[in-house]
From Swiss-Prot:
Disruption phenotype: Absence of vacuoles in the embryo and accumulation of small vesicles and autophagosomes. Embryo lethality at late torpedo stage. One of its GO terms (cellular component) is plant-type vacuole membrane. Keywords: Membrane, Vacuole. The lineage of its organism: Eukaryota, Viridiplantae, Streptophyta, Embryophyta, Tracheophyta. The gene is VCL1. The keyword Ligase does not apply. This is Protein VACUOLELESS1.
Length: 858
């Protein structure tokens, strides 16, 4: 009998059953759909209602000011606001995919509202054409809209996220003065087009055009397979005739047309074949048309809702009140003044169980449970009959339970599945548990207080993540949290949204008390971003609360920037240095640098070693003057001196400061300033003396360049200066440098010997060697000659070397093996020198002969 009562509610359309269960008795009062513009969101979303200003209606006790009211699907008021926007009449209103209410008025201005009836700034516009010509019609899809102006222009916004209006190409006949012929619009959504961009279908009279972003095409349809003589054919050859209304199927593959002669024509958009051609009793265009899933089309006239299928007679539903058709992916919700129904095709699993006279395995299993509850042996008989198909029967019961809105029927079907599962060893046990979890979630959100009547197919398409997002946007945080916990999903999004909403809703709650409330919930989720909540608190003007919240943020990368934004520079510097992240420290340093006076800034970083060192490292490269101020403020005079000294070197490297230029004067002054600063500290006596010597040398070099007119002296060393003077023949200047800087005789001999060898002035070198006995002997002369590759000149000085080892090595270097061997034999080093020479002169037997006595001794 239960099967009979369930199936009795069904309607048969050809070979497919449809059902129309009541979902809600509407909770609202004094709402007449015929007097209002209504926008219903898909997936069981909210309903927006506003009095239709294009109709003359009796106000009764209502205010003359219109109110925009937002209800849930059960008719419970969520929010309302007074509509007082300029721009003319409200032309169109629809919900976007993210549940933003889009309202377009006559002059093309777009007003956006959230679910709480709060206006989202800024207001947008459909463009200048809409403003000048006025909007007469709007067609919305999930994330876009196309508007028709009085001048026949099509203006489209393809994505509400960008809000960029685009003018579509002109449609033939649409911009003509005679617009008395029927015009209708519909949209094929981007996800169903080849280009990935929405296509606007425009019917002008008996022509249908596909309008894309940059082109317009005319559609021609092929003849159907039925008797051609019954088809209407106008003079232009169009088989369909004048179109008065049209809609696109949910999958974008079919186009439904209602013609001037009362025919419903369904066309395949890909093949251009007419799939259905049905003549209605009335030629009046329906007020509404909608697809019911993919199997039938609904047409609504006053008091009559007709459902047409591919074959067979239509099904009629009669209403004594106005209704709104709300298409869904698996059916149509029917909203009236008093209730909300859901018209859908009966799922195959449900049909197999409850169809009158059904003997399917699932029906027998459901019947077996009934016998089992009545302690009848018939239960065992039914199980034996379906033993081979028991898994299939269990699966059908589970699937049917998922499609039910009635909780009692859900339980009965799941009990039948569990009963059959006990006798089915190879069935996946998790399947029942998964369906139970899904149904618990669906039943929770279907509660009238929540008012989201999702079917299981809609729930899977929407996904739990989006459902939770919609719950928290509706401030149903507790339910969202419980669902997140139940489905093992991340709770952070829910708790964070609740915390932000709590701060917004508690302007008079003391910061300390509100902090306790927030922490009590925020601590439920590990790793939650306290910084994000603190940012919201700061945006709400609760800076103290923001500072208290950010103290609990464990991630320095989020904590420090927020501390800076709320003016807590001291705390930010502490947290940044404690983290050891140099990027964060630099962020704080630059922020404070810009915000605070220099002395205050210096005092802040002086006590923080890492911050101070990083600042000094940066300033050394880019901000010398500022760094000098810092060192002076901290008493580090010697550091200022080093900076001055470095500046003098940098000035010398300046390509604009050519040698011998007047810039050497400023350089010397900088060095002298550095010397004066060094002299003020006992620890830097050496640096003071070095700076003094540097300045003195720079002056002499500048004078030399001026006298020789050769820019080759400045920035060279004392040795190089002396050597250059000798090379140039300026012996007097070389002696002056030697005397001025107290160059030792030993170094003088080395420098002069090599300088004379460089210019190959061998006579002068020989004369120099004979002036007086060299303090280091004749080795500098030997080295200079060998270095100049002058063996003959070297032989003048090698015999004068007193050290046998040095003499032998000198002979060896110029290739005189015998003389080198003689010196090595006379040297008192145990044959070590001979051994070295033997390795140097591989083919020379002299060293082997001389080494024999030493080898015998060893």
């Amino acid at each position: 009998m239960a099967n009979v009562s369930v199936a009795a509610e069904w309607q048969l359309l050809y070979d497919r059953y449809y059902r129309k269960p009541e979902i809600y008795q509407m909770k609202w009062k004094h709402v007449d759909l015929s007097r209002n513009k209504v926008a219903c969101a898909s997936f069981g979303g909210p309903i927006a209602v506003i009095r239709d200003d294009s109709k003359i209606v009796q106000l009764y006790a209502e205010s003359a000011l219109r109110k925009l009211r937002i209800f849930n699907s059960a008719g419970i008021l969520l929010s309302e606001t007074v509509w007082k926007h300029p721009g003319g009449r409200l032309i169109g209103m629809s919900w976007s995919d993210d549940q933003t209410l889009i309202c377009i008025v006559q002059d093309g201005t777009i007003y956006r509202y959230n679910i709480h009836a709060e206006l989202i700034e800024p207001n947008m516009s459909m463009g200048q054409e809409c403003f000048e010509q006025n909007v007469v019609e709007c067609v919305f899809w999930g994330n876009g809209v196309v508007c028709l102006t009085e001048g026949g222009q099509l203006i489209c916004i393809f994505d509400f996220k960008t809000m960029k209006p685009s003018k579509l190409p002109d449609v033939p006949g649409l911009a003509e003065d005679d617009l008395l012929q029927p015009i209708c619009l519909t949209v094929r959504e981007p996800k169903y087009t080849m280009s990935g961009i929405a296509e606007v279908l425009v019917a002008v009279g008996d022509d249908i055009f596909v309008v894309e972003e940059d082109m317009v095409q005319t559609i021609r349809f092929d003849e159907p397979s039925v008797d051609d003589s019954e088809m209407q054919n106008d003079d232009s050859g169009n088989l369909i005739g004048v179109v008065q209304k049209m809609i696109v199927s949910p999958n974008g593959k079919f186009l439904t047309l209602f013609t001037h002669d009362g025919r419903i024509v369904v066309v395949d958009m890909e093949t251009k074949q007419i799939a259905i051609d049905y003549s209605c009793e009335s030629a009046l265009p329906p007020q509404q048309m909608a697809w019911c899933g993919m199997d039938s089309v609904l047409l609504y006239w006053d008091e009559d809702l007709m459902m047409v299928g591919p074959v067979g007679d239509p099904v009629h539903y009669f209403y004594d009140e106005p209704i709104i058709l709300i298409p869904e992916c698996d059916g149509v919700r029917i909203l009236s003044n008093t209730n909300l129904e859901f018209l859908q095709r009966v799922p195959d699993s449900t049909e197999s169980i409850f169809k009158i006279g059904s003997t399917s395995p699932a029906a027998l299993l459901y019947d077996a449970l009934d016998h089992f509850d009545r302690r009848s042996a018939k239960a065992d008989e039914n199980l034996r009959l379906i033993r081979s198909s028991l898994s299939e029967a269990v699966e059908s019961c589970i699937d049917a339970a998922g499609h039910e809105f009635d909780v009692t029927r859900q339980r009965a079907l799941l009990r039948a599945a569990s009963y059959g599962q006990a006798f089915c060893s190879n069935f996946q046990r998790e399947r029942v548990q998964e369906t139970c979890r899904t149904l618990r979630v669906l039943n929770a959100v279907r509660d009238p207080a929540i008012g989201i009547p999702l079917s299981i197919q809609q729930y899977k398409l929407l996904t739990p993540v989006v459902l939770i997002s919609r719950l928290i946007n509706a401030n149903c945080h507790l339910l969202a949290l419980r669902i997140s916990e139940y489905l093992d999903m991340n709770k952070e999004v829910v708790i964070m949204h609740w915390a932000c909403a709590k701060i917004t809703a508690s302007p008079s709650t003391p910061d300390s008390h509100l902090l306790e409330i927030l922490l009590d919930k925020l601590q439920l989720c590990k790793g939650i971003s306290y910084a994000a909540v603190a940012t919201h608190a700061d945006n709400c003007g609760r800076r103290k609360l923001a500072a208290m919240l950010v103290e609990h943020e464990p991630r320095s990368t989020k904590q420090v920037p927020l501390l800076l934004s709320i003016g807590e520079e001291d705390t930010a510097l502490v947290k940044a240095t404690e983290s050891g992240d140099t990027d964060l420290v630099y962020l704080v340093i630059f922020h404070i640098w810009q915000k605070r006076p220099p002395l205050e800034f210096f005092a802040m970083i002086q006590g923080r070693v890492l911050a101070r060192d990083l600042f000094v490292a940066y300033a050394r490269c880019h901000k010398h003057e500022f760094l000098k101020d810092f060192f002076l403020s901290t008493g580090q005079i010697h550091e200022v001196a080093f900076l001055l000294w470095k500046e003098s070197w940098d000035m010398g490297k300046n390509p604009m400061a050519s040698k011998g230029s007047p810039l050497h004067g400023p350089r010397i002054k900088l060095i002298e300033k550095a010397r004066n600063l060094f002299s003020q500290t006992k620890e830097h006596t050496f640096e003071s003396k070095a700076a003094e010597e540097h300045a003195k040398l720079l002056k002499i070099q500048h004078e030399l360049e001026a006298s020789t007119k050769q820019a080759i002296f400045v920035d060279s060393s004392i040795n190089d200066t002396i050597r250059t003077c000798i090379v140039l023949g300026n012996n007097r200047a070389a002696i002056k440098v030697k005397t001025e800087f107290k160059v030792s005789d030993k170094r003088w001999y080395w420098l002069k010997a090599f300088a004379l060898a460089t210019i190959k002035d061998w006579a002068a070198l020989e004369k120099f060697s004979k002036e007086k006995r060299p303090p280091m002997g004749f080795r500098p002369f030997v080295e200079a000659c060998i270095d100049a590759d002058e063996k003959a000149e070297a032989l003048k000085y090698i015999p004068k070397l007193s050290d046998l080892v040095e003499r032998g090595e000198a002979y060896a270097r110029i290739g005189m093996a015998k003389e080198a061997a003689d010196c090595a034999a006379q040297a008192n080093d145990g044959g070590e020198l001979l051994e070295r020479f033997r390795k140097t002169f591989v083919q020379n037997a002299i060293f082997d002969t001389l080494l024999m006595p030493f080898q015998g001794a060893s």
